[in-house]
Amino acid sequence: MPNASRVVIVAGEESGDHHAAELVKQLKAVYPDLEISGIGGKHLRAAGVHLISDLTRYAVTGLTEIIPFLKIFRKAFQDIKQHLSTQKPDLLILVDYPAFNLRLAKYAKKKLGLKIIYYISPQIWAWKGKRIHLIKDCIDKMAVIFPFEKTIYENAGVPVSFVGHPLVKKIAAAKDKHSSRTSLGLPLNEPIIALLPGSRHSEIERHIPILVNTAKLLTLDSPKLRFVVPIAGTINPDKVKAYFSNQNLTVTFIQGQAIECMSAADFVIVASGTASLECALLEKPMCIIYKSSFLTYVAAMYFIKVKFLGLCNLLANKMMVPEFLQYDCNAIELSRYISNFHNNPNQPESMINQLAKLKESLSSSQADCSLFDLVVAELPEKNA
C-alpha cells in the first residue's frame, strides 16, 4: 500500500479537470496522505490538489485561436517542468491535452526518468498517427476510454488498459426528462430544444449566431417551441445572452448543468466534443455542429484521416447522428433537418436504439480495470 507518495497530475481543459478530480477524490479517500499537485482547474483545486497553473481558463482550439495565449502556455510549461524537477514525483498522470502533455511526457521521461500514466489517449487514430512512437518511448501505461484504442496500442506494443468511459457512470446518475425539467424550472409539456454551442470562446462566436437563426426559423412553424442554453463555466454568461436579446425567442439560460439541460430537452443541437458524446449516452435525439476558422478547416481537411467528426459516429463507424460542419453548418440546413426529423416518427426511435447500443459498448462492465486500480498498481510501496 502506498504511503506518502507524490503524484503530479496535469489536466489542461475543463473536461479533463473534471475527470481527473474524480480520480483524486477516490485516491484521497483511501490514501489521505498522498501528495498531489499539478496543473488543473476548479475541480482539481476543490479535490485538494495543489495547483501550479490553471490552463482551463484558456479554452482554445485551432491554429489561429491559440496564438494570443502562447506566452501563457509557454510559462505554464516551464513552471511544470521546474516543479517536476524539484518534486521528482513517484508518478506523473497526464490527462488528455496532447499538444501540451506529450511534450511534457518527453521531458519527464528523457530528462527525469519519471513513471508516467496517460489517461484519455490523443486521437492518434484521427490525425498525427506517428505520435504513437513518442507514446511508446515515453509512456509507461496508457489508460484508454474507447475499446478500439486498446487494439491500436496493443498492436504497437504499448502497455494499455481499457478503463471504461468516465461519462457512462456520470450519465447513469443523470435525472430523467421529467425530473430535469422540474429541477431547471422548465415547463413539463412544451417542446424544448437544447442548444449547446461549445465551451471555447471561438466556438461561441461562430456557433451562437447560427443557433439563434435556427431557433428563429423553427419557431415560425412551432411558436410554442422553447430553448434551453447551458453556459459553460469558461464563458461569460452576458456574452451568450446578448446574442439572444430582442430575438423574440423563449430561451432559458442555465449556468453549467449541460447534462441536465440535454436530459430535459426533446432534441439537442450540440457542438462536436465531449458534450456530443454526453448527449449520445443520454440516448437523446440530436445533431452535431461545428464551424472553425478557414485556416483550421483547411488544415483539418489535409491532416485528419477519419470519416466523421462526432465521437458517437466515429465509434459506430457510421453516420448515426447527422453532422453539420463548416459550410453546411447554417440555419437553413439545421432547421430543415430538425423539422423533417420530428415529422418522421421512425427517425427518433431508430436513433435512440442505436445510441443505446453505443452506450453499452463503453460501459465499465466491459473494462479491463478501473483507472483507480491502475494508478494504485503503479504507485510504489513505501514504508511508513
Curated annotation (Swiss-Prot):
GO molecular function, one term: phospholipid binding
Family: Belongs to the LpxB family.
Catalysed reaction, written as an equation: a lipid X + a UDP-2-N,3-O-bis[(3R)-3-hydroxyacyl]-alpha-D-glucosamine = a lipid A disaccharide + UDP + H(+)
Classification via InterPro entries: Glyco_trans_19 (IPR003835)
GN (gene name): lpxB1
Enzyme class: transferase
EC number: 2.4.1.182
Protein name, per record: Lipid-A-disaccharide synthase 1
Primary role: Condensation of UDP-2,3-diacylglucosamine and 2,3-diacylglucosamine-1-phosphate to form lipid A disaccharide, a precursor of lipid A, a phosphorylated glycolipid that anchors the lipopolysaccharide to the outer membrane of the cell.
GO cellular component: membrane
Top-level taxonomic group: Bacteria
Keyword vocabulary terms for this entry: Glycosyltransferase, Lipid A biosynthesis, Lipid biosynthesis, Lipid metabolism, Transferase
Classification of source organism: Bacteria, Pseudomonadati, Pseudomonadota, Gammaproteobacteria, Legionellales
GO annotation terms (biological process): lipid A biosynthetic process
Pathway field: Bacterial outer membrane biogenesis; LPS lipid A biosynthesis
